[in-house]
A protein has these predicted regions:
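Charge-dense, E/K-rich amphipathic alpha-helical interfaces
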Residues: 2-99
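Short flexible coil/turn linkers enriched for glycine and charged/polar residues
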Residues: 12, 98, 114, 131-132
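Structural signal for conserved beta-strand scaffold positions within catalytic alpha/beta enzyme cores
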Residues: 88-90, 105-106, 120, 140
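Short, conserved loop-to-beta-strand elements that form functional interface hotspots
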Residues: 94, 111, 121
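Non-DNA-binding regulatory cores of transcription-related proteins
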Residues: 98-113, 117
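A hydrophobic membrane-anchoring alpha-helix module
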Residues: 117-142
Length: 142
């Protein structure tokens, strides 16, 4: 009968609308979860980046003092930051790598084997969760 056929068509139409809405909702949910995760990661990144100059100042202060209290505070702060994924780059003596280092200046190499090697670090570089947070500013032998 025509009535049953109309009901069948209406049911198919409503089912189609339902599936589309459900699909849209799932996509929205996934997108907002990704945005939230991205916000947390980038917020953490920006916070860590803002703290790096404080770490630099702390290290300069440590070089000028023998105060054990200052050393304890520095070590405690560094340990917390490391637990959050911060890691200093160890680059002195390594081959220069433009993906990790920023060459501030170049000096003549004392020997052939030293060419292209980082001979001094002007400003430490850091990783955050194994991604470069700040490039190491270095002096390279040529």
């Amino acid at each position: 009968s025509i009535k049953v056929q109309e009901m069948g068509e209406k049911l198919a139409e409503l089912n189609d609308k339902y599936l589309r809405l459900y699909s849209e909702y799932e996509n929205y949910r996934k997108r907002t979860n990704l945005e939230k995760a991205d916000l947390l990661i980038n917020g953490s990144r920006e916070m860590m980046k803002a703290i790096l100059p404080v770490i630099d100042d702390f290290e300069r202060a440590l070089a000028a003092t023998e105060d054990e209290g200052v050393k304890l505070i520095y070590n405690k702060m560094l340990k917390i930051l490391e637990q959050k994924g911060l890691k200093a780059m160890e680059v002195k003596g390594e081959k220069f790598d433009e993906n990790l280092h920023e060459a501030i200046t170049r000096i003549p190499a004392a020997e052939e084997a030293m060419k292209g090697t980082v001979v001094d670090v002007v400003e430490k570089g850091y990783y955050l969760n194994d991604k470069v947070l700040r490039y190491a500013k270095v002096v390279v032998a040529f």
